[in-house]
């Protein structure tokens, strides 16, 4: 396979560290630079626990793109920084794979239009774990037969956004096979505000944030005399790397924005 030159934004995070290791062990990936505001001017190999790669770290993406030729930007930063990075990448015609979440419908619409206008491949993935993508697709299938459903997503206590992008995407897919419906008793009253979670067309989303968790979600469907639960668990960040690898390889052949890994897997 042809060599792909990659920039990683956010190499110090747990996901970023796994992505750097992915670069090292994948023959056709070449890490040409990284972006980290705290370590500008250093090398990847200077960071604790990193492999002996000589990619330069830049303090900001703009400077990096001025000095480095790359094929793909892999962004694993925070929601706000990720939004800035993907906007800059699309405007500069650089393909990007974005692993941060928290995009609004309006932001996705604007990015989709710009990516189409620039004919630049872009993938935004709420979750890179193949199992999580299958969990979402199975939930979409089940919604055709079970109209009553609630989503419980559980993540580590350092996650910034709630609900998770995976939960939002799951509900989006479920709604394609389910009419808007108010679940529970029509006169239901919350004794404590927020007790029933977020409500999207009658689908309740509950967010749990605790140390010890990584990324987990279960989708509970209820019917007369039966329950169906679809669950996925990521026990470490290595679970996301197969999806990261697939996304980088796939975005090279795209000329538009794709939201969600389920749209690029067979």
Curated annotation (Swiss-Prot):
Q: Which UniProt keywords apply?
A: Amino-acid biosynthesis, Cytoplasm, Diaminopimelate biosynthesis, Lysine biosynthesis, NAD, NADP, Oxidoreductase
The positions flagged as active site in the entry are: 155, 159
Pfam families, A to Z: DapB_C, DapB_N
What is the name of the gene encoding this protein? dapB
- UniProt pathway annotation: Amino-acid biosynthesis; L-lysine biosynthesis via DAP pathway; (S)-tetrahydrodipicolinate from L-aspartate: step 4/4
Family as reported in the entry's similarity comment: Belongs to the DapB family.
**Subcellular localization(s) per the UniProt record:** Cytoplasm
* The keyword Oxidoreductase belongs to this UniProt entry's keyword annotation: yes
Q: What does this protein do?
A: Catalyzes the conversion of 4-hydroxy-tetrahydrodipicolinate (HTPA) to tetrahydrodipicolinate.
Report the protein name in the record: 4-hydroxy-tetrahydrodipicolinate reductase
Stretches of the chain forming a coiled coil according to its record = none
Q: Which CDD domains match?
A: DHDPR_N
The positions annotated for binding NAD(+) are: 10-15, 99-101, 125-128
- InterPro entries (alphabetical): DapB_C, DapB_N, DapB_N_CS, DHDPR_bac, NAD(P)-bd_dom_sf
Q: What is its main location?
A: cytoplasm
């Amino acid at each position: 396979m042809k060599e792909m030159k990659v920039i990683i934004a956010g190499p110090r995070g747990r996901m970023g560290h796994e992505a750097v290791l992915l670069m090292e062990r994948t023959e056709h990936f070449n890490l040409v630079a990284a972006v980290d505001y705290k370590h500008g001017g250093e090398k990847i190999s200077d960071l604790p626990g990193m492999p002996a790669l000589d990619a330069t770290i830049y303090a900001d993406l703009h400077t990096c793109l001025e000095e480095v030729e790359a094929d793909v930007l892999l962004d694993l930063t925070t929601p706000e920084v990720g939004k800035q990075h993907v906007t800059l990448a699309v405007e500069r015609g650089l393909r990007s794979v974005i692993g941060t979440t928290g995009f609004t419908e309006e932001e996705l619409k604007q990015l989709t239009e710009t990516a189409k206008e620039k004919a630049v491949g872009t993938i935004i993935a709420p979750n890179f774990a193949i199992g999580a993508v299958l969990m979402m697709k199975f939930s979409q299938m089940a919604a055709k037969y079970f109209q009553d459903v609630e989503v419980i997503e559980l993540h580590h206590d350092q996650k910034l956004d709630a609900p998770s992008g995976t939960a939002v995407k799951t509900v989006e897919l479920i709604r394609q096979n389910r009419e808007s419906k108010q679940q529970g008793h029509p006169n239901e009253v919350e004794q404590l505000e927020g007790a029933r979670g977020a409500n999207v067309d009658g689908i309740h989303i509950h967010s749990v944030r605790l140390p010890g968790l990584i990324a987990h979600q279960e989708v509970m469907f209820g019917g007369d005399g039966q329950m169906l639960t679809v669950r996925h668990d990521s026990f470490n960040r290595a679970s996301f790397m197969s999806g990261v690898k697939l996304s980088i390889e796939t975005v090279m052949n795209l000329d538009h924005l794709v939201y969600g890994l389920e749209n690029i897997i067979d």
